[in-house]
Regions:
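Surface-exposed interaction/ligand-binding surfaces
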Residues: 1-345
Length: 345
């Protein structure tokens, strides 16, 4: 049979960054058998020099991440930060609460976490990937490995000074310690790993919630954000006892799920059913983005020509910090007498 052979040559380069920043190392290129081939490029992030290392460390390791020695873990080597994207908001204005782990320890495990109940807020959690992604970060002169533990979008439900209470975490850290036992030195390289239990608490966060301005429109929906509204009707020509459907679509970003349904004033002669609501939204840092679809179903019982007035939709525009009112079109429907008893339900 055919025999093939392959060979490879590896080139290794050792680089040292002169300055902090994000860099892209372009792909290397070679020409083999007349064809040019290019390898992939590599992106790297270089942190500033660590100011929290041990004095015994030399300059070559000053950019790496090291925990302090000993049998304890300091609050500077491991902590969890709770941060709000905004601390001065309006009622119902969305903001993001992030819990982020900062560590200089390489071996840690989260045993238990107790988060506050977010009293005074409506909360929705942002979905995270199942596996934590640790990234290096320079914070207050020291280098850490960090990961986002959990994130929530919060909507304050009342004005005044509200507080996000501390979250409580219980963690276990595996820390290597040197042993003076000659047997340990021979069999284990002179080091053992001890487990250290550590309780961590995040600070309380104050959120200043401003009331919505005075002068709310009579038809204020409770919406806070940026929205549009549109309407459609299934038919303007129908017979008695046929269903008529008007669909309203409120689109935009904000507290979409918390917006009250606009009222359609159907003629008194129509039998009106409860509206059907479909929230097609996704969670973003600004709130819920997408569409709130409301379908209104009514049945005319008598023939005639009827006017269905458009709806008025008022909300608080977070960008202009003012109330805005949007209106949909009126509909005129022609109802003819259908077969059978028009009075039948």
């Amino acid at each position: 049979g055919n025999v093939t052979s392959t060979s490879s040559i590896t080139f290794t380069y050792i680089l040292m960054a002169n300055n902090a920043g994000e860099y892209t190392i372009p792909g290397a290129s070679i020409v083999a058998d007349g064809d040019q081939m290019v390898s992939n490029s590599v992106k790297i992030k270089v942190l500033p020099q660590d100011q929290g290392g041990n004095s015994g460390q030399n300059n070559s390791s000053s950019g790496s991440i090291h925990s302090s020695s000993g049998t304890s873990v300091s609050n500077q080597d491991l902590f969890i930060m709770a941060s709000a994207s905004k601390t001065n908001v309006y009622e119902q204005e969305a903001f993001v609460l992030t819990y982020k782990i900062y560590t200089r320890e390489s071996n840690l495990q989260l045993n238990n976490a107790k988060l506050p109940d977010f009293k005074g807020f409506h909360s929705q959690e942002i979905e995270m990937t199942t596996n934590a992604r640790w990234t290096p970060e320079h914070y207050q002169g020291r280098n850490y490995y960090t990961t986002v533990y959990r994130q929530f979008v919060l909507f304050p439900q009342q004005s005044g000074k509200l507080y996000i209470d501390p979250a409580q975490f219980q963690m276990t850290i595996g820390k290597p310690v040197q042993s003076d036992d000659p047997f340990d030195a021979f069999f284990n390289g002179g080091s053992n790993v001890i487990e250290i239990k550590k309780n961590i608490s995040t600070p309380k966060i104050a959120i200043n919630v401003n009331p919505l301005p005075t002068g709310k429109p009579a038809d204020f929906s409770g919406g806070v954000g940026e929205f549009n509204i549109s309407s459609s009707i299934n038919s303007k020509e129908l017979k008695t006892n046929d269903a008529i459907t008007i669909k309203l679509v409120i689109s935009g970003t904000g507290n979409l799920k918390l917006i009250s349904n606009p009222e359609i004033k159907f003629p008194d002669d129509f039998e009106v059913y409860d509206p059907k609501v479909d929230n097609q939204v996704r969670l973003t840092r600004e709130g819920l983005t997408g569409n709130k679809i409301i379908e209104y179903l009514a049945i005319p019982r008598h023939a005639g020509t009827y006017k269905i007035p458009g709806v008025s939709f008022s909300y608080f525009d977070i960008r202009s910090k003012s109330y805005k009112t949007l209106k949909t079109e009126d509909y005129v429907v022609n109802v003819e007498k259908g077969a059978g008893n028009a009075e039948q339900v």
